[in-house]
Amino acid sequence: MSIQNFLLSAVLRWQKKSSLKLSAEHRFRRNRKWLADVRTKTKASITIQSDRIAGVPVEWVMPSELVSARQSPVCLYFHGGGFGMGGPNSHRALAAYLAEKAQIKMLMVDYCLAPEHPFPAALDDAKAVYLALISNQSESEAEADSAEIYNAPRPPRPLFIGGDSAGGNIALATLQAVRDLPPLPNLGAPPQGIFLLSPWLDLTHQNPSMLSNEKTDVMLNRQILEEFRERYAPGVPATHPRLSPLFGPVDGLPPCMIVASQAEALYDDSIKLHQKILGQGGSSTLLAWPKLPHAFPVMAGQLPEARQALDQLAHWIGQCAR
């Protein structure tokens, strides 16, 4: 365990303990504001562009030398935050690091948040952006100023899709939802890979790690997760496959990489998805790290372990993109 992880975990554990003394609403509003105020300084070699695709706000994070590269890989990414907080700004450290290491254009989706926009609003935003991207009907406002970046006969290839925590849920549910649509014309190739970082996939919260890791998870527990679920999907059965994509189909998925901490309450979500994909003949790689916080790769600006995990992810992306 790095000293950075030791210190950060101590802070997160204290924050979790103190926040549980607050009302659920107070805790949610405080954390939402904190994530909204996060500002990450990126290298001068990283270009950040705000945009809209299919009416949904997005942010491109990419190495500056790839701005005009029409065939470089693109990663459609969905941030975590319990479906109710966070945004491209809160995940910019991860996006910038992975963009540079994998030489990929990160497309960060600023999907609408609960409780103002309950289920399935976030998933609807995700599907709209994904379908627009693979059909080359992106309606990108930035294209007017930099059309040569994206305005190719087909979107830049290869395409990847990913997300952390609730964003991992959205990423997987998006692919499952799109596969159930009737055939659509003019669609490009499906993603060459999907990666999920500490994904929150089973919203019944009945997996053994929910209890066995209650003391080792420095960020989450069942109470906190159920509060997020009730804000996002009040009245929706927790077993609904679009809400809990672990219960949805996984056959036909592209190669999958899952990164998780063995200490987190959601660890079994990752294990079960990995086993389910392998059991149906698919390709899945699970990287299980000990003694790290939930969604630790997001903390690329603080943790050396986060950067090491993203280095492994970048290598995997490179292999899938060949």
Predicted regions and their residues:
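A glycine/proline-hinged amphipathic helix-loop "lid/cap" segment
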Residues: 1-66, 322
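Alpha/beta-hydrolase superfamily serine-hydrolase fold, recognizing
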Residues: 49, 53-322
